[in-house]
């Protein structure tokens, strides 16, 4: 039994079904062209030493598909600085912070529920969202490990904030706002 040799072919196109395949001319020679493949979106090699943010690589789908977290509607997208000002300032209503990402499926579902909640609690709660990719360091400081992550912050500074992670039902959000804040 002969061992297959691994060879790199810079001019070979990327395989259609797998990352490697056997050459029909030389059945024991494995062609592996992943290392030479230039990504058409990034216009550079996939193994470049240059680093890019996840947001530049993972573009959100077109708005026409409907499956996209909108930048602003009723629940406003805010920065880390805006959140810090909201937390330090005096409020008469609870603050709900949604840490999300545009590529996150559960975040898209949660965004729809939060928009409904924003209509329902229009003057009784302040709901904002933070893009965890745009505000990576702030999300890390807030111990966001999974998405979506919600923080429910009471207007009473003596009450602890409530943190949830993952998709939660709208009724649970109502219960937290009505009973725990």
Swiss-Prot record:
Keywords linked to the UniProt accession: Chloroplast, Disulfide bond, Electron transport, Oxidoreductase, Plastid, Redox-active center, Transit peptide, Transport
GO biological process, one term: cell redox homeostasis
Chief localization: plastid
Disulphide linkage map: 104-107
Transit peptide range per the UniProt entry: 1-70
EC number: 1.8.-.-
Domain Thioredoxin: 71-181
The organism's place on the tree of life at top rank: Eukaryota
Protein name: Thioredoxin-like protein CITRX1, chloroplastic
Native species: Nicotiana benthamiana
């Amino acid at each position: 039994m002969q061992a297959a040799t691994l060879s790199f072919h810079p001019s070979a196109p990327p395989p259609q079904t797998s990352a490697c395949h056997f050459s029909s001319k030389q059945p024991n020679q494995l062609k592996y062209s992943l290392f030479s493949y230039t990504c058409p979106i990034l216009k550079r090699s996939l193994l470049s030493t240059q680093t890019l943010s996840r947001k530049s690589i993972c573009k959100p789908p077109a708005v026409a598909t409907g499956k996209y977290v909108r930048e602003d509607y009723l629940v406003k997208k805010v920065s880390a600085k805006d959140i810090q000002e909201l937390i330090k300032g005096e409020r008469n209503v609870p603050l709900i912070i949604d840490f999300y990402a545009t590529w996150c499926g559960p975040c898209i579902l949660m965004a729809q529920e939060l928009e409904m909640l924003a209509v329902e609690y229009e003057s009784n709660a302040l709901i904002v969202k933070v893009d965890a990719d745009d505000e990576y360091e702030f999300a890390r400081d807030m111990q966001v490990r999974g998405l979506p992550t919600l923080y429910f912050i009471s207007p009473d500074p003596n009450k602890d904030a409530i943190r949830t992670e993952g998709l939660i039902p709208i009724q649970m959000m109502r219960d937290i706002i009505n009973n725990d804040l």
